[in-house]
Design a protein with these regions (language model features):
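Acidic/His- and Gly-rich active-site-bordering loop/insert found
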Residues: 85-202, 211-229
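Metal-dependent amide/peptide-bond hydrolase catalytic core
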Residues: 85, 316-512
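Bacterial N-terminal signal peptides
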Residues: 65-78
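Sec/Tat-exported extracytoplasmic proteins
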Residues: 93-100, 104, 108-111, 115, ...
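Sec/Tat signal peptide C-region and signal peptidase I cleavage site
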Residues: 79-84
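Histidine/acidic-residue-rich, glycine-tolerant segments that coordinate divalent metal ions
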Residues: 152-153, 189-201, 207-208, 220-342, ...
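N-terminal secretory signal peptides that target proteins for export/translocation
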Residues: 1-60
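Divalent metal-coordination and catalytic microenvironments
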Residues: 107, 167, 206, 233, ...
Length: 512
């Protein structure tokens, strides 16, 4: 079968190669054909810059090779080059784009809530098995919740001695009704853990993450001659519930499977155009702690507040008072957020209730700052109750849900810098942006273990139509963001960049 374009090189050729899809078809003087590397390995290389440095290759070939012999030796001896590796990866990604887009649309149309990712995990497991990975399903144990199944998936591909690298994705979706109008939009409705019927949507891009992981898994399975070590593909459930990473670790993730030297992940973002990636060394995302506070009083008739102790008034003062924690007690060099997201109290206009319940979220980078905020919340609640004459038997109840706590995400600076250089080489310097940290949270941080024993890095993947982002910046009207019913990444450039960047990162960490 004829190849798209064939270049024939004389023995003395040292010049540029035309860009585009090529296969090198070398002929001996007698006319006997030397089959191309495309024929040998089923690959067609894309040469974007169009220059083949035979001088560099000659230095790695046996002494005395001519230009032609050097080229042939390098093609058939498996000598890798950065340009050759990139050309191979580019061609493979382009070949797989139709399949990746189909996978993404299927996942987007069939989201599953946290703790219920049964079909999604089974799909990922099946895809990894088909690629030759050794797959273990149902990894994850949720302490105190025997009714939740562990839907974590671990796929291992061993390739000789070398580092162990984990690539992680999330599996779950959100209770959001999709309003994108896409032809593959989710129409799923189901019951959540509380038994309420809700709509479900991949409103945080985990479908992009899953597809990128599967694409990366395929690229690396086909490029095994260019890396060595143990590659682990990790599909984590219940990220949105901040419980899946801990569940997998509690189920022996690092004892049942090889302990990683590095763990890497990506996350789509509305802050960048599709085709770009972002890196954030050091603190990248905040810790998250949910707090419930019950302010108690003495109920009574709304017409006679003087004989009651009004917890609604307590709550009003408390909400205002805690605004001073960040502004007056926290150092401006230690970012923190205290947000009251829910207040519930009372049933009728003429009844003073016995209690008011508040729900808060705390976000910090440093653990000592988090502990100080928790102490300040207790102190202020007690002080306001005392000022209202609340008896000690009705003191406020302040409860921090440590089971719902997620530590701050700290990207190992050295690993992040290394990946940043890889991305600049693969995507171009203009397509790699250093992003500031944010106060959002997620549980990827747990894979580093305590005291940051394992270097981890989560980088950001641009997912927005460049023109829409430019218009947003001109007009000041934000594009739909994560967790929005309108969140709709641009699939093709986002997936192309996700697979290329993640595969290149692994190849660098596991290079021979």
């Amino acid at each position: 079968m004829p190849l798209p374009w064939v270049a024939r090189f004389p023995d003395t050729y040292w010049g540029p190669l035309p860009p585009g899809l090529i296969a090198v078809n070398l002929h001996r003087p007698q006319g006997a054909t030397v089959t191309s590397i495309a024929d040998q390995e089923g690959m067609v290389r894309r040469l974007e810059s169009g220059i083949l440095n035979l001088e560099l290759l000659r230095g790695r070939a046996p002494r005395g090779c001519s230009a032609l012999a050097c080229l042939v030796w390098c093609l058939f001896s498996g000598v890798p080059s950065a340009r050759g590796q990139q050309a191979t990866l580019d061609a493979l990604v382009e070949r797989e784009m139709p399949s990746l887009l189909s996978t993404y649309r299927s996942l987007h149309a069939a989201p599953e809530l946290s703790h219920h990712e049964e079909k999604t995990s089974a799909f990922v497991a099946g895809e990894l098995r088909a690629l030759g990975y050794t797959v273990t399903e149902h990894v994850g144990k949720y302490a105190g919740h025997p009714e939740w199944s562990g839907y974590g998936v671990v796929g291992v591909l061993s390739n000789g001695q070398g580092p162990t690298v984990y690539v992680r994705t999330e599996l779950d979706a959100l209770p959001v009704e999709e309003m994108t109008g896409l032809p593959y939009a989710s129409k799923v409705r189901t019951k959540d853990d509380a038994g309420r019927e809700v709509s479900v949507m991949h409103a945080c891009g985990h479908d992009i993450h899953i597809t990128s992981l599967l694409g990366t898994a395929k690229m690396l399975a086909e490029m095994k001659e260019q890396w060595h070590g143990t590659l682990v593909m990790l599909a984590q459930p219940a990220e949105e519930a901040i419980s899946g990473a801990k569940a997998m670790l509690d189920d022996g993730l690092y004892t049942r499977f090889p302990k990683p030297d590095f763990v890497i992940a990506l996350h789509d973002t509305p802050a960048l155009e599709a085709g770009k990636v972002g890196i954030t060394p050091g603190y990248a995302m905040a810790s998250s702690t949910s707090v419930e506070i019950t302010l108690r009083g003495i109920g009574g008739h709304g017409s006679a507040p003087q004989v009651a102790k009004d917890p609604i008034l307590e709550a009003a003062e408390f909400v205002l008072a805690i605004q001073t924690i960040v502004s007056r007690e926290d150092s401006p060099f230690d970012p923190a957020v205290v947000t009251v997201g829910s207040i519930h109290g009372g049933t009728r206009p003429n009844i003073i209730p016995d209690e008011v319940r508040l729900q808060l979220t705390i976000r910090t980078y440093k653990e000592e700052v988090r502990q100080h905020i928790l102490e300040a919340l207790r102190r202020m609640a007690q002080g306001i109750a005392a000022a209202h004459g609340i008896p000690p038997s009705l003191s406020p109840i302040v409860t921090a849900d440590e089971s719902d706590h997620s530590p701050a995400l700290y990207n190992d600076p050295q690993l992040t810098a290394r990946l940043g250089q890889v991305f600049k080489t693969v995507l171009g310097p203009d397509h790699v942006v250093e992003l500031p940290p944010v106060m959002a949270s997620e549980d990827f941080c747990r894979f580093a273990l305590e005291d940051r024993q394992i270097p981890i890095c989560q980088f950001s993947l641009g997912a927005v139509d460049p023109e829409k982002l430019r218009e947003s910046r001109r007009s000041g009207v934000p594009v739909p963001g994560l967790h929005s019913s309108l969140w709709a990444p641009v699939p093709e450039p986002t997936l192309r960049t996700g697979v290329k960047s993640m595969t290149s990162a692994v190849l660098d960490l596991m290079k021979k």
